[in-house]
Amino acid sequence: PFIYDALSEIKVRGNSTALADKKGYNFKFSSKNNLFGFGEAKKWSLLANAYDKTLIRNKIALDLAKDMGIEYSPESTFVDVWLNGKFVGNFQLTESVEARDCRVDIDIENGDWLLEIESSRVETDVDYIITPEYGIRFAVNEPENITKEQQREIYDKIGKVETAIKSGDYSSVENVIDTKSFATFYVFSEFMKQVDFSYSSTRFYFKDDQKEADLQRKLRLENNKA
């Protein structure tokens, strides 16, 4: 067994799932740990799978995403969890979503971005951008605490993507997004019935001036019941 005594932070995770009796958690170590060979990192997540009696649908989804070639799909495994000396159930340990070479391999220091579609949730320490053409609301996951210049740069880059899509010119779209990654992610989301993937908790990243779709999310209540 592995024993780690460096836990520095733990909090309830999720939106609708945070209301379940069996809650999921995000937790952080004070130093990096390589859990189950997934790579060294401080931040990790425990999915409760509270609305899935089988407990396996999120695991199947993440494994399918990897088989379909969706980049940076989180590694995960099942674990039994004790909290304050009490057994609280079987959970799915996953990598948290963050820009790291062993997770989402993008270079934040040199202008890459990690964004999240979030239509309504408001967090005081997060910057948000509403796109010019379609009014889509993005949370800027990384970098944190962006400057007005960075905010404008992100706004303009997303604006170019939307302008290309609106033009109906496929070659223009190919110039600003990785169309294969978007198509693969769309097919995956349709197959898994991810009814919220277009408006909440769906992440994208800009890397080397190109926008790519990426899984990096959990399946929500609706998908677990599908």
Where are these regions (language model features)?
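Phosphate/dinucleotide-binding and metal-coordinating scaffold of catalytic cores
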Residues: 1-226
